[in-house]
Amino acid sequence: MAGGSKPRHGSLQYWPRKRAEKAIPSVNWSVVKGDGKTDSFLGYITYKVGMGTALVKDLTDKSMTQGKKIYMPVTILEAPSMKIYSVRFYKNNKVLKDVVVSNDKELRRVILAPKQPKSLDAEVPKEFDDLRIIVFSIPSQTSVKKTPDLIELAIEAKDKLAFVKSLVGKEITLKDFLKYSLLDLRGLTKGKGLVGPVKRMGIGLKAHKTEKGVRRPGTLGPWHPAHTSFRVAMAGQLGMFSRVTYNNKVIGSGTISEKNINPAGGFKQYGNIRSSYIIMKGSVQGPQKRQILLTPSFRPTKLTAKKKYELVEMQL
């Protein structure tokens, strides 16, 4: 029987293939927009709980299963509250001023917070083009860890400064953000460590009488040019890469106090959900307890936008 053949799947879109430097990827906020109708911030920090099966009612118009109950795989993300750490003022795409407005004790685990936070009213510069906020999660509300995660978020509002002033010192919840049915999920993939070129780049195995190894590339390149191209399939790091999954459908959300979805004994390798949660259709990159940043979808498709589902029951 002949062996199967396929092209190598080592995409050159992502390079260099090395471990990500940050747990939460940076975002190009110039392309992320909200609905344009309400004042909102454009990101939220969550933690991956795990996967399950959801029984949903398909409400999609002209769907083959319209009005019927169907099963689909879902991913559950826990979303504890967040707070504003500082307000950044920009001018000509450069940071003009960074005003720290919080010194919560949770921050002492990751940064050197000031003993006394500054007043935002007294520190507003005379001229600025844009402002963003640096928020930190409160993972002590979860069973994951105690160290908060910080990320810079953009804001969409008619009066951004007034909107930020209304949020300073208050806890931001998932309900304040969740106004979208499609979300982009940013996070790191599951780390695999050092792996060979067959698993990493998808090259084929050599014949059984081949010298110098079967799971190796046939050549590293010609004699001249006398250097090895970065396109050559070689062993190296696999996983722990920064990736974005686009147009993920929101199936449902809530809080544990309203509806408890914890299975008996808790979720495997995670524990029990203690705060708010969001249920997404399909799979999400990364292992359990990995940080996932939610942002509004910046290039939604008509097909995914028109799909509607009503959560009936979770089966975990």
Question: Where on the chain are the PLM-derived regions?
Answer:
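Extended basic (Lys/Arg/His-rich) segments that typically form rRNA-contacting surfaces
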Residues: 1-189, 194-316
